[in-house]
Regions:
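C-terminal helical/coil "lid" or tail adjacent to the Rossmann-like core of SAM-dependent
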Residues: 2, 178-237
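Conserved alpha-helix/loop element of class I SAM-dependent methyltransferases that forms part
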Residues: 3-22, 37
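Class I SAM-dependent methyltransferase SAM/SAH-binding core
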Residues: 25-27, 31-83
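A short acidic, Gly/Pro-enriched loop at the edge of an enzyme's catalytic core
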Residues: 82-92
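A short SAM/SAH-binding and catalytic strip from SAM-dependent methyltransferases
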Residues: 91-105
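A short glycine-rich, Lys/Arg-flanked "PGG" loop and its adjoining helix->strand segment in the class I
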Residues: 106-121
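Conserved catalytic/acceptor-binding region of the Class I
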Residues: 123-192
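Core SAM-dependent methyltransferase catalytic element
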Residues: 173-176, 242-250
């Protein structure tokens, strides 16, 4: 089954106009998940530069790129607000769940815009905790999992409402916003988004902040238990809203 959130991102890239032959900067790329989506879209005549501050994540991204046989990607260690000048100017910049972690999202967007050509695209997707979790009837385990994740993100100083703040931040950064949207991250008994890998990746942080213990989470069985809870209730679960927007550099 295709990843629900990747499908949202693919639609956003499509509608924004990320296309074959483009040279794209993917900021806060981590291990390259979005970088690879963009790389497949721009094709052999295009190129994607993934940028992150974490050398361990970048090493993992390079390994994954080799495993996927992608020759049109490069990964560099740098701060997203200060893209090295030697990289030149890009046709577009992309990011996913990145601005929410910036102490000043407007300043970060201004720095990113400096690396984009005049008229170039800046495309971002940001999650937002303002709405959700919601289901009828309520699903206690789903609510707990959502709290584990969002309480951890909150303790790390992230903006839990970056989705709603996305378009205004782009405008304040001097960009011309062309479109903003919000889609619900939904799960049903038949549509499933795996939470186990997310919790496993966040495990050290969740435990460190005292939000939950490893035993309490039961990561190895969490996805089966979530699916069982939804199936027994035969209901749709709205986890959170996912905002997307694109703008152009004047």
């Amino acid at each position: 089954m295709a990843d629900i959130r990747d499908a949202m991102m693919e639609r956003l890239l499509d509608d924004a106009g990320i296309r074959e032959g483009m040279r794209v900067l993917d900021v806060g790329c981590a291990f390259g998940a979005l970088t690879f989506l963009v790389a497949k879209r721009v094709g052999r005549t295009g190129h994607v530069v993934g940028l992150d501050r974490d050398p361990q994540l970048l090493s993992l991204a390079r390994t994954k790129a080799r495993e996927q046989g992608l020759s049109n990607v490069t990964f560099i260690e740098a701060d997203l607000a200060n893209v090295p000048a030697e990289q030149g100017l890009f046709d577009a910049a992309t990011g996913r769940r990145v601005l929410m972690y910036q102490p000043d999202a407007v300043a970060a967007l201004r720095g990113i815009a400096r690396a984009v050509k005049p008229g170039g695209l800046i495309v971002f997707q940001e999650n937002d905790a303002s709405i959700g979790p919601v289901s009828l009837p309520p699903l206690p385990l789903h609510i707990r999992v959502s709290e584990w994740i969002w309480h951890t993100v909150d303790r790390e100083g992230a903006d839990l409402h970056m989705g709603f703040h996305l378009a205004p931040a782009m405008e304040q950064a001097g960009l011309s916003v062309e479109h903003v949207r919000a889609e619900a991250s939904l799960q049903t008994p038949k549509e499933h988004h795996a939470m186990g890998p997310i919790l496993r990746a966040m495990l050290p942080r969740i435990v460190r902040y005292g939000i939950a213990t490893e035993e309490e989470m039961g990561i190895d069985t969490i996805d089966a238990r979530l699916l069982e809870e939804r199936s027994k209730a035969n209901t749709t679960y709205l986890g959170e809203m996912v905002f997307g927007a694109w703008a152009r550099k004047p």
